[in-house]
């Protein structure tokens, strides 16, 4: 596994997610009908939610796989390196080091990622960049949880996020509607806002 491949896969998934949102907006706004089937609000919402999950999982996968690449001593895309404090014999050994006594390593938890990075890399390598987007990362997790979970707590967390971001809680607002809203004071949607954050993070982490 090479960091360049990990990077390209992540960027490709981000691009795919964006294309899905663009396509569903085009179909929905033009009331597309095929063989009597209308491109409904439900279909539109499912596609947007699915696109966001694709984006989030692309970032999660990138964080884990890039971490393994750096543990194996690979340089960044720019050729720069940083010191590592471990020398795993292979990727499986590296993954076991990350997991420790746990069943898996949670690469959706910024605190865990940064702690591991500080344990394994000099000054945390490039993963300290996550500290600069800690708030955005948590917001994305709240949206992810609201899409994939049905708990009262995940719904409350999402509603709190909506209030914080737009100053009110529109009746019956769901994740897809929020993601398709224009960010106050900006010209892009919340989906594009989070996509840009992910792409920027991928680039920064890939280039020490």
List PLM regions with ranges:
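Charged alpha-helical initiation segments
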Residues: 1-53, 57
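Intrinsic-disorder-associated interaction segments
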Residues: 3, 7-13, 87, 106, ...
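Exposed alpha-helical structural elements
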Residues: 16-19, 23, 112, 136, ...
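A structural signal for well-ordered alpha-helices, especially hydrophobic packing surfaces
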Residues: 18-21, 25, 59-63, 144, ...
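Short, flexible helix-adjacent loops and helix caps
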Residues: 26-29, 33, 67, 71, ...
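Charge-enriched, short contiguous segments at helix-coil
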Residues: 33-34, 38, 42, 114-208
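Helix-loop junctions and short alpha-helical segments
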Residues: 41-47, 51-143
């Amino acid at each position: 596994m090479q960091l360049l491949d990990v990077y390209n896969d992540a960027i490709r998934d981000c691009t795919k997610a964006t294309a899905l949102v663009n396509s569903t907006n085009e179909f929905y706004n033009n009331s597309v009908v095929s063989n009597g089937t209308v491109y409904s609000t439900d279909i539109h919402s499912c596609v947007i939610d699915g696109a966001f999950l694709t984006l989030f999982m692309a970032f999660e996968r990138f964080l884990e796989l890039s971490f393994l690449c750096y543990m194996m001593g690979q340089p960044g895309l720019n050729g720069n390196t940083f010191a590592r404090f471990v020398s795993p014999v292979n990727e499986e050994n590296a993954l076991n080091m990350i997991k420790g006594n746990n069943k898996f390593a949670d690469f959706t938890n910024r605190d865990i990622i940064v702690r591991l990075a500080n344990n394994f890399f000099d000054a945390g390598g490039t993963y300290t960049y996550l500290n600069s987007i800690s708030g955005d990362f948590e917001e994305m997790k709240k949206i992810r949880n609201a899409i994939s979970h049905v708990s009262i707590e995940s719904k409350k967390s999402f509603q709190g996020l909506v209030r914080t971001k737009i100053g009110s809680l529109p009746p019956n607002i769901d994740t897809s509607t929020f993601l398709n809203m224009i960010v106050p004071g900006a010209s892009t949607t919340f989906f594009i806002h989070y996509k840009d954050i992910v792409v920027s993070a991928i680039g920064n982490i890939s280039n020490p």
